[in-house]
């Protein structure tokens, strides 16, 4: 069974029911070990005390917050448990919003919400209510040593929860503005036509991580002592004639749509 990252209650009005959270996704990355270049042996991480000038055991380490240079306040795990707010065990629904109202830029992490024993009926009713009203629930939840704003929505006859960034966590200063420039009505028409030609249902199973596949191939080739061939990177020249580039793009998209899609060969 998948690891449970949180257990508690969802509460709205006078109704509450027990739930659990499981991580909905995790990146499928390839992990490399750190090796000593000289003999390719594993390198170990050592915790080192700067004052005593010697290695120490992990059990001797505590958390500390620096209040001024070189002065720390030690914070124990028990201290954090004592100050945990009610949202550490109960998600109180604060409001409901239309499903398209929250900008996806606020989405942080996703979790599956499962019903715990005794909460099946209320869970099913909550899913049905969200489905029928096309609304999502906004609540607060404490886990991983912080309090999150969360969005709970119905998906495939179950509940999914997304933690959200707080407004101050968004780096709005990094946002780019659209350049002030002019384009013709014909250029806009061609751009819209290109969008229409490339519009298709989203099928995530059709996408794959080419970089990961290349790394796996690289590892296998080096294991066999084979030659490593560099992947050719496309060199795109700056667009000089935007109208002509749009026309050619639309034509290429039309041709691609007419051609039957071939099955992708298995790796």
UniProtKB/Swiss-Prot annotation:
InterPro entries for this protein: Ku70/Ku80_beta-barrel_dom, Prok_Ku, SPOC-like_C_dom_sf
SMART domains, per database record: Ku78 (SM00559)
Gene Ontology molecular functions: double-stranded DNA binding
GO biological process, one term: DNA recombination
Keywords, ordered alphabetically: DNA damage, DNA recombination, DNA repair, DNA-binding
Domain Ku: 10-190
Lineage top rank: taxon: Bacteria
Subunit comment: Homodimer. Interacts with LigD.
Family to which the UniProt record says this protein belongs: Belongs to the prokaryotic Ku family.
Its job: With LigD forms a non-homologous end joining (NHEJ) DNA repair enzyme, which repairs dsDNA breaks with reduced fidelity. Binds linear dsDNA with 5'- and 3'- overhangs but not closed circular dsDNA nor ssDNA. Recruits and stimulates the ligase activity of LigD.
Protein name: Non-homologous end joining protein Ku
Organism name: Solibacter usitatus (strain Ellin6076)
């Amino acid at each position: 069974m998948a690891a449970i990252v949180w257990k508690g209650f969802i509460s709205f009005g006078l109704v509450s029911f027990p739930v659990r959270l499981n991580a909905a996704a995790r990146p499928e990355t390839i992990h490399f070990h750190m090796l000593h270049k000289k003999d390719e042996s594993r390198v170990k991480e050592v915790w080192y005390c700067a004052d005593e000038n010697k290695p120490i055991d992990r059990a001797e380490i505590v958390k500390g917050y620096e209040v001024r240079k070189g002065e720390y306040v030690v914070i124990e795990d028990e201290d954090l448990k004592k100050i945990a707010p009610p949202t550490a065990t109960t998600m109180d629904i604060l409001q409901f919003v239309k499903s398209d109202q929250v900008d996806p830029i606020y989405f942080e992490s996703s979790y599956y919400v499962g019903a715990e024993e005794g909460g099946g009926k209320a869970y099913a009713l909550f899913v049905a209510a969200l489905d029928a009203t096309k609304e999502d629930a906004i609540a607060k939840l404490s886990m991983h040593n912080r309090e999150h704003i969360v969005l709970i929505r119905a998906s495939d006859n179950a509940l999914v929860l997304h933690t959200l960034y707080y407004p101050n966590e968004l780096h709005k200063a990094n946002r780019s503005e659209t350049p002030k420039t002019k384009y013709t009505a014909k250029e806009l028409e061609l751009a819209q036509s290109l969008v229409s030609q490339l519009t298709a249902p989203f099928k995530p199973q059709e996408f794959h991580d080419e970089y990961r596949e290349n790394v796996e191939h690289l590892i296998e080739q080096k294991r066999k002592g084979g030659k490593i061939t560099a992947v050719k990177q496309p060199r795109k020249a700056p667009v000089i004639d935007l109208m002509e580039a749009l026309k050619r793009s639309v034509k290429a998209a039309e041709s691609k749509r007419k051609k039957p899609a071939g099955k992708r060969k298995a790796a």
